[in-house]
Amino acid sequence: AHDIAAELWEQGAKNVTMIQRSPTTVTRSSTLLDLQTIGNFSEQAVQSGITVDIADLIVASNHYKTVHLDGQKSVQLLKNIDKEFYQKLASSGFLFDFGEDESGLSIKYLRRGSGYYIDVGGSELIINGDINLESPAEIDEFTEKSIFLNNGKEIDCDLVVFATGYGSMNQWAAKLISQEIADKVGKCWGLGSGTRKDPGPWEGELRNMWKPTNQTSLWFHGGNLAQARHYSKYLALQLKARYEELPINIYGIPVVNHLS
């Protein structure tokens, strides 16, 4: 939503308005980059012999049960580094949070894959008033040339863009294959943390990612660049072993606790 609104404003659209329904976790891109280049992904790490592959392995070795603790530490750093930014964002009326347990954007990404924004300028436009904001609000009614919000406001508009969140992988599986297969596989992504949009029980790993599923020959690959870089190797090895008809011991096919 931020990027669409910012692009419309940059192209000269007048009276761009964002309608925010619920809080969003916001982290500035520059700050996120600074924090992520501390330690294993820093120039100092490279000089000490820690390659990208080694750094990826170190990150992947962290147990998902405790990664939120690191996230909480990062949030405290974020709040101090960007204190003025968050104060201005709050004053603009934009609703934001740092996750249900203050563990931040990265953990929310692992748990639900939505509800966050890596800020590359959209927030500044909201703070400056270049992008109008209605928050919290939802659309109650459309007319020929306007919308009515649930707060009673009417907004004249020539264009309405729905930026209503990310679709899940199993929703795409249902569209591409069938609802039956999607339900057979079950929910993809998330850890079973018991937080919003990531229902329990605890899974221990990301659901149905890079491993055998309940549907033979159906695999799911996704994530950010770092995850794609790292886990694609293990997915490729599993596929190669099957093509070569090598004997394979599987820890266990995921139990389906939630349908797609």
Tell me the role of every PLM-derived stretch.
Residues 25-69:
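A catalytic-pocket lid/entrance helix-loop region that shapes and gates access to the active site
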Residues 2:
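Residues forming the Rossmann-fold NAD(P)(H) cofactor-binding site
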